[in-house]
Regions:
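N-terminal alpha-helical transmembrane segments of multi-pass membrane transport
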Residues: 1-84, 88, 98-105, 116, ...
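Transmembrane helix-loop junctions in multi-pass membrane proteins
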Residues: 5, 35-40, 89-94, 172-183, ...
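Helix-loop-helix module between adjacent transmembrane segments
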Residues: 32-33, 112-137, 148-181, 185-209, ...
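Flexible loop linkers connecting adjacent transmembrane helices
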Residues: 38-72, 96-98, 102-105, 110, ...
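Membrane-interface alpha-helices at helix entry/exit sites of multi-pass transporters
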Residues: 68-71, 102-111, 146-149, 154-162, ...
Length: 479
């Protein structure tokens, strides 16, 4: 690859994932938090009752739509979105953030997640409000539509096309080649399964699932995501439970490191305030995908009517991904004894990328690393399913509904390739395209933040105060 091209990619990544891009992401979440009166904090109990509580008590949330309907249930839309957000980054990525930015990075990951909840909320409110019916009776929605129809004019149309193009390209990198490579490498290391066999088997399974369209992907996701999350959460809680006496010290290290109160350990890893903030923000952004706008495309396919209701699912998505799964990974690493909380050094013989597996091995024996390999298989494969939907929606926006079938065939055909090839460039380009997706999306979210506030105030006035005001449900469709 020409050196000039690689330098250009590094420059772009430095912008979109450097102080400028992360500052924009932080600022967007802060703006929305302020303008909605801290909805994710002040209405904590309300959105938890209407998401997690609704899963347990409201059958309409989990009930499948009729076979002939193109829409999916609220629970299916959540699971399909979580399929892509809960990935290998929740394991390896959190370890990397701690080793590169110190325990304090976890605190700033939490901060980014709290603000990201409102970014995800706004994306999904806009996604429902600006979605459109397709000829088959299903919903078409996503950042492309609120950029085109919400912003309007040539700028809106250009930003919509840019978003869709970058999303389609990103789906082949972070959503396919990179994930298959992680799965194949881990299964080979843990069980001796040849990479080529892994690629062929997963391609065959994916062909059956993906060629069935969004409804089939959603049906798989609603079973896979709860199972894989429960498997990892139970395992991680067991590890943390064994080391329960180390939890107070771990939490203290997180708080001290967050504000640069813990000195650097003298090694290659720094624990200064700036590194803690940078790595915490990066991990929070990469993990929950709030700001990318990707998950809006499956949330918009939900059979929900109220934009705010789907917005609350966006809040819960970030909460589950970062505040639950990533936090558990952080505690697994920090209580394991493999990381010195005072110096930040890794214990002799411990590899940074394998810290979670080592922590599980210390509790479960050799079964621990195999359990992590299975978790990586499930996490990475679910990411593939989620991103296949995003890429397909983007391609259909650019080239029409007929292009979706060709996209799925190409997506499946590339899976065996990803399992066996070296993918350093693919990971780099994935970061690039993800960041380039984020920029037009955040421009739209900021520009339309006033509409988000109006829809939110309208909903709360009707639901909490009995206002007779007409509901704000859609910009152009009869609901």
């Amino acid at each position: 690859m020409p050196e000039r091209f690689m330098r250009g990619i590094e420059v772009v990544n430095g912008i979109v994932w450097g102080p400028m891009g992360l500052g924009l992401l932080f600022g967007t979440g802060l703006l929305l938090t302020v303008r909605t009166g801290g909805f994710q904090l002040r209405r904590w109990g309300y959105w938890m009752r209407h998401t997690l509580g609704a899963i347990l008590t409201d059958q309409s949330v989990t009930a499948h739509t009729a076979r002939e309907e193109q829409a999916i249930s609220q629970f299916q839309s959540l699971c399909t979105a979580l399929a892509s957000t809960i990935g290998t980054g929740n394991l390896v990525g959190v370890s990397t953030a701690i080793l590169s930015g110190g325990a304090g990075a976890v605190f700033w990951m939490w901060v980014m997640a709290l603000l990201g909840m409102m970014t995800s909320y706004a994306e999904n409110v806009l996604g429902i409000y600006y979605r459109r019916k397709d000829p088959a009776g299903g919903w078409r929605g996503g950042p492309m539509y609120y950029l085109r129809d919400g912003l309007g004019g040539k700028p809106g149309r250009v930003l919509a096309v840019l978003f869709a193009a970058f999303c389609a390209l990103a789906s082949f990198g972070i959503g396919n080649l990179s994930q298959l490579n992680s799965i194949a490498g881990n299964l080979n290391a843990a069980f001796g399964v040849p990479e080529a066999v892994t690629g062929a088997v997963l391609a065959a399974v994916s062909a059956v699932i993906l060629l069935g369209g969004l409804k089939r992907v959603a049906a798989v996701a609603e079973r896979l995501v709860p199972a894989m999350a429960l498997l990892y959460i139970v395992g991680a809680l067991t590890v943390v439970g064994v080391h329960i006496t180390a939890v107070p010290a771990a939490l203290a290290a997180i708080l001290k490191g967050a504000f640069g109160l813990r000195a650097a350990g003298g090694g290659i890893v720094g624990y200064g305030l700036s590194r803690a903030i940078t790595w915490g923000f990066k991990r929070g952004a990469f993990s929950n995908e709030a700001g990318l706008g990707s998950s809006v495309m499956v949330h918009a396919a939900s059979n929900v009517k109220e934009p705010v209701q789907q917005g609350m699912w966006g809040i819960f998505e970030v909460f589950a991904d970062t505040m639950v799964v990533c936090t558990l990974t952080a505690l697994v690493v920090l209580t394991s004894g493999f990381v010195d909380l005072d110096t930040g050094r890794i214990a002799a013989g411990a590899a940074g990328s394998a810290l979670v597996g080592l922590a599980f091995d210390a509790v479960f024996g050799t079964l621990g690393s195999k359990l992590i390999a299975v978790c990586i298989l499930l996490f990475a494969y679910s990411t593939t399913l989620g991103w296949s939907c995003y890429g397909c929606k983007a391609v259909e926006y650019l080239f029409g509904a007929g292009a979706g079938a060709g996209y799925r065939v190409l997506f499946v055909a590339l899976m065996p390739v990803g399992a066996v090839m070296r993918l350093d460039l693919a990971w780099t380009l994935s970061d690039t395209f993800n960041g380039l997706m984020m920029l037009p999306n955040l421009i739209g979210v900021i520009a339309l933040s006033g509409m988000v506030v109006r829809i939110t105030q309208n909903y709360l006035a009707r639901k909490l105060h009995g206002s007779p005001a007409p509901p704000l449900l859609s910009a152009g469709e009869t609901i």
